Amino acid sequence: YVAIPARLVIPLGDEIADSVACLTEPFSCVVRASKKIGLSVAESVVVIGAGPVGNMHIQMARLLGAAPIIAVELNPQRAELARQCGADSVITDPERALEQIKALTEGRGADVVIESVGHPELYQQALTFMRPGGRLLAFGLTDAETEIAIKPLEIILKEQRIQGSVAGMGEDMHQALHLLSHQRFI
């Protein structure tokens, strides 16, 4: 057991199962990340990595009205799960990812790219998926020594933004639990 201040406790009603309530923490991270990156209606979104958290990002993007939602995932089972979670398109060939993203976004690139894996090569690739004025959500954790090469002038001239997000806070926890209790996520 751990003693914590009462203000940090979120009471659960009987209507929410423990198996659902335990998802509050990871969903709170996704809730916070969506707010930090400013995800909004009708924006195109690319989610790199359709593991559990990547699929949470897909569901949040759908809930917020993003369109199209594009997942990039090599694993066939995870690719299918991404479709079930709300991805409009799933790209399974990394060699054709940029070409397909451009085709799905009328040649512009994505408004928002979410890297949810934490692999340096995928971060490099994510930078190429953004449209001018686009935003990259750095969500996938790397080790402390990981570095990626960027071209600052390209980011400046294209007015792009890179935003990090790591953990949900109090309000995010409450919002995540509210959404879970109203069955907004599968």
What are these regions (language model features)?
Residues 1, 22, 46, 50, ...:
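Glycine- and other small-residue-rich loops at beta-strand/loop junctions that grip anionic moieties
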Residues 102-103, 144-186:
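C-terminal substrate-binding/catalytic core of Rossmann-like NAD(P)-dependent dehydrogenases/reductases
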Residues 9, 27-30, 54, 110, ...:
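A general structural signal for well-ordered alpha-helical segments in protein cores
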Residues 8-18, 79, 158-159:
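Glycine/charged-rich beta-loop-alpha catalytic/anionic-binding loops adjacent to active sites
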Residues 1-9:
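Glycine-rich phosphate/adenylate-binding loop and adjacent beta-alpha elements
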Residues 10, 46, 70, 91, ...:
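Structural detector of well-ordered beta-strand residues that form the stable sheet scaffold
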Residues 37, 80-81, 85-159:
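Glycine-rich cofactor phosphate-binding loops and adjacent beta1-alpha1 units
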Residues 17-95:
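Mid-domain Rossmann-like dinucleotide-binding core that forms the NAD(H)/NADP(H) cofactor-binding site
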